[in-house]
Each structure stands twice: as structure tokens, then as C-alpha cells.
A protein has these predicted regions:
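ATP-binding/phosphotransfer module of carbohydrate and carboxylate kinases, centering on a glycine-rich
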Residues: 1-6, 16-21, 38-47, 61-71, ...
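A charged helix-plus-loop insertion that forms the helical arch/lid used to bind
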Residues: 20-33
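Short glycine-rich anion-binding loops that position phosphate/pyrophosphate groups of nucleotides
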Residues: 12-15, 80-82, 202
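Active-site-adjacent loop/helix segments that line or gate small-molecule/cofactor pockets in enzymes
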Residues: 55-59
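Structural signature of FAD isoalloxazine-binding scaffolds in flavoprotein oxidoreductases
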Residues: 100-103
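Active-site glycine-centered loops adjacent to acidic/histidine catalytic or metal-binding residues
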Residues: 54, 80, 245
Length: 253
């Protein structure tokens, strides 16, 4: 412990970064709200502690040592079981008044949409997450993948079949990409970033996902916002959050 200067913690949920406390979970994790993460570590180790949302940490990691290095205005969206993300503006992490800004999975894109775990309807992650894509295929499993049981359908299987020329699945993926696009275009029009960074396992599908997404984004975005706009995949994978937690502790962002 003598060599430690502090603890940088990447945590899931809505994190009050000022207090180091979990302030919300969007209905995902029982008994996590109001956990005083920072105080627990301070009481045990008597060292500085910072606690930040895991998606915000991923953004800071990528800005420090990854695909977003050198950029000062960045929107990052992580696509997986849900949707996470973070926003860097003029080189600083956007945290909001209580440190919980950037809950990108839970802005509604459909007023009469599906019920979300957060209690709202039509949330972005209900249509733009990998879970959403899997559910789209499962709902039509008898038609789209009659040789596979619904329980065995996942994102990897879907993209493998699209890469092998499955046009029906490609159409479903295109519809899903449009949902992702609509949310990202809104964020681009609000924040005017230099870079939109896409994280999550699906981000490694350059030809089947990133390139079609890029084309759709530029087709929907107003021309002035497209100037110098870059859209690309994150680089650091699961290490991004760990590196970002250290970066925040070191006051780099």
C-alpha cells in the first residue's frame, strides 16, 4: 500500500462522482443504489478515491491511450447488453450537476415504445443495443433461423450468417443500424463532436457494422455537423474502463 497514490474505480450504474455513491441503476442491479463506494475504500485504506461510471471510464481510457487520443470533443457509445456512453467536451468529461450525465441508453426515441427496465418507454437501448438486435431475430426465429433454437441466437451468430450472405438477416441488421443512427444523429446535433467512437464487441465488425453505420449517419446528419466528423471503433476493449478510472483519478479529464 505504501506505493499506492489512490484508487480509481470504474463502476456500473449512475454514479454520483462528487460523492462516490451509486445513485441509480436503471432497474438493472438490485441492492446497488446508495452504495457508498468511495467511503468504503477511504475508510479501509485512507487514500484518495474516485468513482466514475464504467462507460465514462471507457471514454476517458480511449481519450488517454486509445482511439480518441488527441480529440477534445468526443461522443462515445458502447453497444452491448444495453447502451452506455460518455461525452467529452473541450477536453473535459461532461458529468452534470450530480455527476450522472451521459445516460445514453435511456433517452426515449419512441413515445409509445417498449417498456424499459428504467420504467420509461421507448428508450434508446431497447432498440439500439445488441440485445435489441438479438430480440429482433428471436421474434422471427422460425423464419430467419429455423435451424437454431432461440436460446442459441446471439450477436456473433447473426453477424457470422450475414457475412456468409444471409440477405434476410442483413435486412434485420440494417433496420437495427438505423435505430442506432437516429440516436447518434441526435447526439451529433446536440454536441457537435469531432469524433463519434463506437465501443462494444460489435464495434469490431468494420465492414458489416461500422461502415454501414457511418454511411447512415452521414446521410441523416446536417451538412455543417459532418465537416471533419470522424466515426470509428474503440481500440482498448475491456481495458478502456480500467485505464479511464486511473485517468480520472489523475485529473487528466
Amino acid at each position: 500500500l505504501a506505493e499506492l497514490s489512490g484508487f480509481g474505480i470504474s463502476a456500473t450504474g449512475q454514479i454520483d462522482t462528487k460523492e462516490g455513491v451509486v445513485s441509480g441503476t436503471a432497474g438493472h442491479i438490485a441492492n446497488w443504489i446508495q452504495t457508498p463506494i468511495a467511503q468504503i475504500f477511504k475508510d479501509s485504506y485512507h487514500l484518495p478515491v474516485s468513482v466514475v461510471n464504467d462507460a465514462d471510464c471507457a471514454l476517458m481510457g480511449e481519450c488517454w491511450l486509445g482511439a480518441a487520443r488527441g480529440y477534445r470533443d468526443v461522443v462515445m457509445v458502447t453497444i452491448g447488453t444495453g447502451i452506455g456512453g460518455g461525452i467529452l467536451t473541450e477536453g473535459r468529461l461532461l458529468t452534470g450537476v450530480r455527476g450522472i450525465a451521459g445516460e445514453l441508453g435511456h433517452f426515449p426515441i419512441r413515445a409509445d415504445g417498449e417498456l424499459c427496465s428504467c420504467g420509461n418507454r421507448g428508450c434508446y437501448e431497447k432498440y439500439a443495443s445488441t440485445t435489441a438486435l438479438v430480440n429482433m431475430v428471436r421474434d422471427r426465429a422460425d423464419e430467419l433461423v429455423p435451424d437454431i433454437s432461440a436460446d442459441h441466437i446471439d450477436g456473433q451468430l447473426i453477424f457470422n450468417r450475414v457475412s456468409q450472405g444471409d440477405t434476410a438477416l442483413r435486412s434485420v441488421v440494417s433496420e437495427w443500424i438505423t435505430s442506432i443512427t437516429l440516436g447518434l444523429v441526435g447526439l451529433i446535433h446536440i454536441f457537435n463532436p469531432q469524433l463519434v467512437l463506437i465501443g462494444g464487441g460489435v464495434s469490431q465488425q468494420e465492414d458489416l457494422f461500422i461502415e454501414p453505420l457511418r454511411k447512415q449517419i452521414f446521410s441523416y446528419t446536417m451538412p455543417g455537423f459532418c465537416k471533419d466528423l470522424i466515426i470509428k471503433s474503440a481500440q482498448l476493449g475491456n481495458n478502456a474502463g480500467l485505464l479511464g478510472a486511473v485517468a480520472y483519478l489523475k485529473n487528466l479529464f
